[in-house]
Curated annotation (Swiss-Prot):
This is Caveolin-2. It comes from Oryctolagus cuniculus. The lineage of its organism: Eukaryota, Metazoa, Chordata, Craniata, Vertebrata. Residues 87-107 dip into the membrane without crossing it. Residues 1-86, 108-162 are cytoplasmic. The gene is CAV2. Transmembrane segments: none annotated. Monomer or homodimer. Interacts with CAV1; the interaction forms a stable heterooligomeric complex that is required for targeting to lipid rafts and for caveolae formation. Tyrosine phosphorylated forms do not form heterooligomers with the Tyr-19-phosphorylated form existing as a monomer or dimer. Interacts (tyrosine phosphorylated form) with the SH2 domain-containing proteins, RASA1, NCK1 and SRC. Interacts (tyrosine phosphorylated form) with INSR.
Length: 162
């Protein structure tokens, strides 16, 4: 721990052009996977999930672990993230997609067949309610407020400074 003074016997040379800066696993033979397929997130809904090892684990200059530990932990992080994601999607993707589809269908049905007719009915009845409310206000509330206002208008307040 701390600032290392020994040299690691492992060296890694890499051109900037050959180094992939994405957070996925780099396969040894890129010819085996020539096309990654269409973009499955064209609107960038999950762009916040594009995390790399450096985004999660960061060691300041004053506290570096051994180089071999850093390299092994980086490799283990990337491999476990890749393998565990694939494993979880095999078992959870289809049931969760089904549940999301059912939920979306239920919410759409409720919105189309219950909520919108209720809102439209309220908007149809609202002008009648508005007319009745205006009449109640003019007949009951306006005279009441006027009489209370006249009563309090005759109240006088005198301040004396002693």
């Amino acid at each position: 721990m701390g600032l290392e003074t020994e040299k690691a016997d492992v060296q890694l040379f890499m051109d900037d052009d050959a180094y992939s800066h994405h957070s996925g696993v780099d396969f040894a033979d890129p010819e085996k996977f020539p096309d990654t397929g269409p973009d499955r997130d064209p609107h960038g809904l999950n762009s916040h999930l594009k995390l790399g090892f450096e985004d999660v684990i960061a060691e300041p200059v004053t506290t570096h672990s051994f180089d071999k530990v850093w390299i092994c932990s980086h490799a283990l992080f990337e491999i476990s993230k890749y393998v565990l994601y694939k494993f979880l999607t095999v078992f959870l993707a289809i049931p969760l997609a089904f549940a999301a589809g059912v939920l979306f269908a239920v919410l759409s049905c409720l919105h189309i067949w219950i909520l919108m007719p209720f809102v439209k009915t309220c908007l149809m009845v609202l002008p009648s309610v508005q007319t009745i409310w205006r009449s109640v206000t003019d007949v009951v509330i306006a005279p009441l407020c006027a009489s209370i206002g006249r009563s309090f208008s005759s109240v006088g307040l005198q301040l004396s400074h002693d």
